[in-house]
Curated annotation (Swiss-Prot):
Belongs to the aegerolysin family. Residues 62-75 have a biased composition (Polar residues). Pfam families: Aegerolysin (PF06355). The keyword GTP-binding does not apply. This is Asp-hemolysin. InterPro entries: Aegerolysin-typ. Keywords: Cytolysis, Hemolysis. Residues 47-79 are annotated as: Disordered. One of its GO terms (biological process) is symbiont-mediated hemolysis of host erythrocyte. Coiled coil: none annotated. The keyword Nucleus does not apply. Residues 1-5 form a propeptide.
Amino acid sequence: MASVQAYAQWVTVHLINSMSSETLSIQNASLSWGKWYKDGDKDAEITSEDVQQKTAPPGGSVNVNSCGRSDASSGTTGGFDLYDGNTKIGRVHWDCPWGSKTNDFDVGERNKNYWVEIGTWNKYGGAIGTVDVEVGRKR
């Protein structure tokens, strides 16, 4: 059975692709703390390479999940780059530390030719939760 403490620190990035013909892809997925996991199962760890295989088709979506490790007093800190083909859209980054009162979530290094909308997320204590990150191309 996994540690409730570590698994209480989690984030699900729900990527929503609002582009009409381009597919969103993920590159440079990395974690300083925690682990990646399959949708709905914190015990089913996946690799950064598995995360980088995920895509969101035009008009579709995909989830990227991370949490703290069981039996460790650590949360999750990490991120990944969002791409449209060879064009970087921005870098999704979060910090959901164990034992801290504040969380952080942002999409930085944004490309001016795209819009990115970040949904609500839990800033204070516990899990960041599920965060919608919707991406589109400016006209």
